[in-house]
């Protein structure tokens, strides 16, 4: 799928950076620092939902490197569980955005953030 291991590293880093960008755009709304615009939230969640499926294939065997810790490959089952928890939380975030319910959106947003943090704490090298 990737010609060189470094291509996989760049691909997953790019996908994760874009996810962080679209997630971050919703933070002021969730924190009550910006008005709730349902259409804008839905647009960001839709992009996030699409992006959330992308980086995982770029963590295949032989693609070690970047900010990824070796435990991704040595404890692949746990990594996959955290990946699945994240994607399950994205589905909940999408449902909350579709419902237009700010309280549900806040709760789901928190769950997505917590799943991001759990994976980063376990599998991303400290900067």
From Swiss-Prot:
Ligand binding (heme c): 12-13, 67, 116, 119-120
Positions bearing Pyrrolidone carboxylic acid: 1
GO biological process: electron transport chain
One cellular component (GO) term of this entry: periplasmic space
Record's comment on post-translational modification: Binds 1 heme c group covalently per subunit.
GO molecular-function term, one example from the UniProt record: electron transfer activity
Principal localisation: periplasm
InterPro entries: Cyt_c/b562, Cyt_c_II, Cyt_c_prime, Cyt_c_prime_subgr
Cellular location(s): Periplasm
Superkingdom, natural source: Bacteria
Function, as annotated: Cytochrome c' is the most widely occurring bacterial c-type cytochrome. Cytochromes c' are high-spin proteins and the heme has no sixth ligand. Their exact function is not known.
Subunit structure: Homodimer.
Protein name per UniProt: Cytochrome c'
